[in-house]
């Protein structure tokens, strides 16, 4: 690989010298913040927590592969191939939330602001409420993704040929949103008006929830593995191309009939995106190890990490937007204080 070549943007600003390099020493699949501590989720067994200037502290959470993880800033919830759902809080305390009775793999996890946790094993989605009441729902095929709605206790369960919307506290039959194909990651817009899935094919699909009108977002050269809502939820940033693709969601029709913005193009595929919590800025990671910060209004770029390494697996901002963490698949990682 060659050194980073900004092409026409030869005057690109670099902050690479301000990045604190971290050697996690193991493959990384995700990163989240617990308060001001960056927590790098390993592919196997452990989470590596970095607090202040200290070296990464290893916390054992599973007896095998870590298949999924999510966080609300107060705790990280993970699912593993040991059939367990585990929580790690900011104090470093590990607690078991659930163990699948059949020891099936825990493929997906989701967190609700009120403390409810959802997870899936095979074709079954589970919810444990804040009062420890557990409920389950079977869907036609293996669950591909889970997401809680921002308002009310409603869970979106993505699977083959559509998404099931489940109100676990209501007796009504779950609502089914149909669209042919395999639906994986799923996300509600912050204003609760839209639902979007990343599909097994190189495309996104969406529904306007007021009338279930379809929204088709295509044109990707590869599968979309990372999506992030902008601050305020007016746009959706996505990986899957050699630029960050941002779909507009400011109007009542969402992206229907509109072209997406294309930011930070490189000669490498975008593998991870993370939007700043308050400002119109995003971080983008690429398959060649590059990390950029991008101002969404005009596309201005700042180089955070040069290429020449493994693909970027994960990016995360802390809640204040003052720290950016990134990690490559091979465990090379970094922290940037803004």
Language-model-derived ranges and their functions:
Residues 1-338:
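WD40-repeat beta-propeller superdomains and closely related acidic/aromatic-rich repeat-like regions
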């Amino acid at each position: 690989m060659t050194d980073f070549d900004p092409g026409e943007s030869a005057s690109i600003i670099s902050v690479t010298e301000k990045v604190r390099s971290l050697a996690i020493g193991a493959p990384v699949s995700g990163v989240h913040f617990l308060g001001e501590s960056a927590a790098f989720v390993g592919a196997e067994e452990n989470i590596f927590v970095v607090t202040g200037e200290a070296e990464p502290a290893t916390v054992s959470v599973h007896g095998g592969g870590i298949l999924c993880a999510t966080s609300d800033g107060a705790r990280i919830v993970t699912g593993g191939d040991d059939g367990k759902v585990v929580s790690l809080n900011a104090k470093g305390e590990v607690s078991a939330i659930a163990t699948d009775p059949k020891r099936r793999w825990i493929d997906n996890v989701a967190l609700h602001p009120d403390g409810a946790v959802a997870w899936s094993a095979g074709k079954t989605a589970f919810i444990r409420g804040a009062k420890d009441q557990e409920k389950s729902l079977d869907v036609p095929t293996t669950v591909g993704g889970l997401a809680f709605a921002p308002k009310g206790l409603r869970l979106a369960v993505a699977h083959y040929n559509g998404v099931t919307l489940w109100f676990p506290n209501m007796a009504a039959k779950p609502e089914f949103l149909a669209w042919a194909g395999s639906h994986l990651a799923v996300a509600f817009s912050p204003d609760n008006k839209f639902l979007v899935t990343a599909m097994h094919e190189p495309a996104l699909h969406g529904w306007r929830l007021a009338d279930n009108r379809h929204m088709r977002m295509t044109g990707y050269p590869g599968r979309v593995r990372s999506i992030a809502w902008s601050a305020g939820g007016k746009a959706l940033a996505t990986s899957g191309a050699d630029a960050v693709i941002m779909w507009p969601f400011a109007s009542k029709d969402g992206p229907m009939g509109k072209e997406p913005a294309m930011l930070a193009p490189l000669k490498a595929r975008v593998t991870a995106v993370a939007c700043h919590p308050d400002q119109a800025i995003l971080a983008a990671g690429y398959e060649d190890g590059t990390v950029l910060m991008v101002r969404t209004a005009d596309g201005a770029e700042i180089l955070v990490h040069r290429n020449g390494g493994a693909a970027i697996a994960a990016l995360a901002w802390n809640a204040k937007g003052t720290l950016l963490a990134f990690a490559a698949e091979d465990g090379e990682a970094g922290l940037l204080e803004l």
